[in-house]
């Protein structure tokens, strides 16, 4: 059995209030010592106002909050900044960056030759957002004419700084990938399905979404009632215009996928059900008013049909049509203990998870478990329902790969996200002692003993 650990980079220990790249190499060393083969992270694109990486203002950019400030200081890219709280980090980076020094580097020039169009667009969106606020408040002429705004402001100092910081982000991330390879750890990335309601994608390519004449959504995203919410969930992102996306052979989406495959060793496709059909909710209505629309997912993924680097999130409202679509690909699906309980799912997943970012880690799962679920677990395990026995169950399912949440191994873990809520999510962090040598030995021994 190969073991993987699920932990967002923002959950790494940090004194700034939010994890970043500064502890990534330490964590990779910890994972190797603990016997893990995979590190699954959440998206590393910019986050929304609620810190969610799944409602990003730019699905292709990097989250500048993740930059390792101390490393930038050591390499002379920043004037001395010192400790800074994450809430002030972006402003501090903009004011302390040695812009001309970074721009003079051959690496930066090569980066801009390869990715300049995308990165400049991201910088322009940052500039316009700081000037006008939420997209709905932008002047209509700015909303509807990205290219005129670009021509007028592409050389603005703030846009140039954004491009330079984006280069430094990719440089730091490349170093982390190389470190992971050196430790024999594969990093599993995550491809969100939708951008957020305010996004550079909506501004730069409005034809890719179902929008009205003022570029406001006619439909928004969400899901009907499911195991997370009886009334359904309203995600509120503008929905894709799949006819328009298909008309140019999915160039936008395929470029996103190619970029993600270059950024990670393996790639999880979030909300894979959305590539077979997707739920449309009329703007201003509740999820109950929504309906399903077909999506040409088989054509979209044709170039990667046999590519082994993908895994898919096949959770939520699933039907026979979805399973027929899913089974046209060779990619493993997911089974999640905290969602399925002791009964296996209707198909055998190739990757098993104790939980994901939307569920409690095992100690909290046990603590909150209702009596009926506890009774079913006792029948299956023939003993007490506790974290240790659930770890036994996960290890002995005979799956090729099992993923754990780091919180499964902690006395007082926290939860990453509660679906259907906005506040208090995407903030949980590991205590520093959770990734020391003793912790690695304990986890390695724990899994080794259970694998016997």
Which residues does each predicted region cover?
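C-terminal accessory segments of extracellular proteins
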Residues: 423, 440-452
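Aromatic/hydrophobic pocket-lining residues that form π-stacking "cages" and hydrophobic walls in ligand
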Residues: 27, 176, 322
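Catalytic domains of carbohydrate-active enzymes, especially glycoside hydrolases
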Residues: 23-47, 262-266
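Short glycine/serine/threonine/alanine-rich loop segments
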Residues: 36, 185, 331
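Mature N-terminal, pre-catalytic/accessory segment of carbohydrate-active enzymes
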Residues: 1-23, 29-35
């Amino acid at each position: 059995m190969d073991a993987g650990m699920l932990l967002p980079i923002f959950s790494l220990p940090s004194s700034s209030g939010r994890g970043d790249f500064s502890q990534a190499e330490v964590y990779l060393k910890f994972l190797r010592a603990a016997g893990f083969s995979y590190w699954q992270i959440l998206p590393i694109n910019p986050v929304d106002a609620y810190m969610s990486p799944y409602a990003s203002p730019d699905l292709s950019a990097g989250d500048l909050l993740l930059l390792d400030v101390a490393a930038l200081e050591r390499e002379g890219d920043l004037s001395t900044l010192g400790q800074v709280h994450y809430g002030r980090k972006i402003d501090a980076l903009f004011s302390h960056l040695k812009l001309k020094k970074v721009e003079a580097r051959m690496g930066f020039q090569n980066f801009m030759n390869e990715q300049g169009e995308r990165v400049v667009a991201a910088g322009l969106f940052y500039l316009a957002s700081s000037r006008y606020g939420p997209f709905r408040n932008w002047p209509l002429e700015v909303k509807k004419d990205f290219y005129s705004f670009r021509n007028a402001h592409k050389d603005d100092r703030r846009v140039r700084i954004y491009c330079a910081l984006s280069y430094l982000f990719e440089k730091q991330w490349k170093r982390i990938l190389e470190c992971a390879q050196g430790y024999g750890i594969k990093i599993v990335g995550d491809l969100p399905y939708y951008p957020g309601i305010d996004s550079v994608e909506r501004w730069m390519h409005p034809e890719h979404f179902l929008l009205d004449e003022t570029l406001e959504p006619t439909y928004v995203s969400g899901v009907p009632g499911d195991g997370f919410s009886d009334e359904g969930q309203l995600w509120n992102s503008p929905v894709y215009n799949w006819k328009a996306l298909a008309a140019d052979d999915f160039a936008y989406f395929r470029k996103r996928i190619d970029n993600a495959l270059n950024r990670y060793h393996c790639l999880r496709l979030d909300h894979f059900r959305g590539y077979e059909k997707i739920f449309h909710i009329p703007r201003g209505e509740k999820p109950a008013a929504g309906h399903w629309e077909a999506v040409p997912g088989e054509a979209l993924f044709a170039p990667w049909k046999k590519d082994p680097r993908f895994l898919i999130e096949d959770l939520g409202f699933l039907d026979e049509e979805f399973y027929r679509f899913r089974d046209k690909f060779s990619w493993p699906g997911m089974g999640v203990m905290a969602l399925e309980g002791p009964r296996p799912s209707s198909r055998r997943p190739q990757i098993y998870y104790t939980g994901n970012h939307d569920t409690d880690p095992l100690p909290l799962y046990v603590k909150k478990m209702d009596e009926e679920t506890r009774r079913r677990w006792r029948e299956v395990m023939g003993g007490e329902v506790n974290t240790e026995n659930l770890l036994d169950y996960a290890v002995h399912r005979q799956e090729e790969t099992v993923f754990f949440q780091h919180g499964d191994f902690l006395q007082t873990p926290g939860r990453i996200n509660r679906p259907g809520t906005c506040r208090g999510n995407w903030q949980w962090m590991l205590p520093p002692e959770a990734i020391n040598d003793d912790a690695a030995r304990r986890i390695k021994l724990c899994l080794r003993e259970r694998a016997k």
